[in-house]
From Swiss-Prot:
Enzyme Commission numbers on file: 2.3.1.51
Keyword Cytoplasm among record annotations: no
Family: Belongs to the 1-acyl-sn-glycerol-3-phosphate acyltransferase family.
Protein name, per record: Lysophosphatidic acid:oleoyl-CoA acyltransferase 1
Length: 300
């Protein structure tokens, strides 16, 4: 792995795009696991159909728990567990929440938190794209490099007043060892929240305060993916291990121009383990090309 030093942060030593070392199950084990999944899917088919018709998030939770042994642990910063109220402390309609991304399953994680229908957002070069759950999953499984192929542009937050809105601000996935630089600037994020600031007096616009909450998502390493991977291979990774997710809903942060406060919050409050801004989506694109090329050479 030393050859990938171009994609290792000089300050922290973290290589955010390197895949985790995961032992693949045997073909026999994979076949057995997929067979069990098929049986579970048939059993849950009525609930799956009902979820597709109603979009009720609690139904999705039941499906995931039975089918994939999904377990989740949710904490709200500053609130004792016994005092947490979903109607007050969980993500609400009309609001925007900033999330990190390590896995296509992050889409399910935020849906289970949401107190209403969900919109998923992924920025790229200051343009915000809206994607469905399926589009988000396909995007991450394809390597998380070209969101414009999966979603469509959305101009402002006011268009999403009837949904709970989650933005995966890094614009791609990483291995969870740090938080990548965002694919949207502070200026553009503020304009997305309130386009009227573009017509304000510059001095007045500068004094306008914006606050957002972040949601830090952690999952077991078998579910984390930074590289293109097939649906079948991805399923086989975690079917025998189950899925364990931890979500932390952080306190609101006042937005700065560089949005570093949001990255720090998503990184568990550790600003010293943030990778540099050069390790962005374009850097990942180059890493993926070289890594896949090297893997092909090894197989020859």
């Amino acid at each position: 792995m030393e050859k990938y030093t171009n994609w290792r942060d000089n300050g922290t030593g973290i290589a955010p795009f390197l895949p985790n070392t995961i032992r693949k199950p045997s073909k026999v084990m994979t076949a057995c696991l997929l067979g069990i999944l098929g049986v579970k899917t048939i059993i849950m088919l009525p609930l799956i159909m009902l979820y597709l018709l109603t979009g009720q998030n609690n139904l999705l939770g039941l499906i995931l728990k039975f089918t994939f042994s999904w377990k989740e642990e949710i904490t709200v910063q500053g609130i004792k567990k016994r005092d947490v109220r979903k109607s007050k402390h969980y993500p609400q309609k009309g609001k925007l929440y900033i999330c990190n991304c390590t896995s296509p399953l992050d889409a399910f994680s935020v849906v289970l938190l949401a107190q209403g229908p969900v919109t998923l957002l992924v920025p790229s070069n200051d343009i915000v794209y809206k994607v469905s759950i399926r589009e988000f999953i396909n995007f991450i499984l394809a390597g998380g490099l070209d969101i414009k192929l999966y979603g469509h542009e959305v101009a402002e937050l006011s268009q999403l007043g009837n949904t709970v809105n989650f933005m995966f601000a890094e614009g791609t996935s990483c291995n969870g060892k740090s938080v990548l630089p965002f694919s949207i600037t502070g200026k553009k994020l503020k304009e997305f929240i309130d386009p009227s600031i573009t017509t304000m007096n510059p001095a007045m616009a500068k004094t306008k305060k914006f606050e957002l909450q972040t949601i830090q998502i952690k999952t077991n390493k078998t579910a984390i993916t930074t590289l293109p991977i097939s649906n079948m291979e991805y399923l086989s990774r975690f079917l025998n291990k189950g899925i364990n997710v931890k979500c932390k809903i952080n306190e609101p942060q006042v937005l700065s121009d560089n949005l570093e406060e949001l990255r720090v919050a998503l990184n568990g409050g550790d600003k010293y383990k943030l990778v540099s801004r050069k390790l962005d989506v374009e850097s990942k694109r180059n890493f993926v090309k070289e890594y896949i090329s090297d893997q092909r050479k090894k197989r020859k």
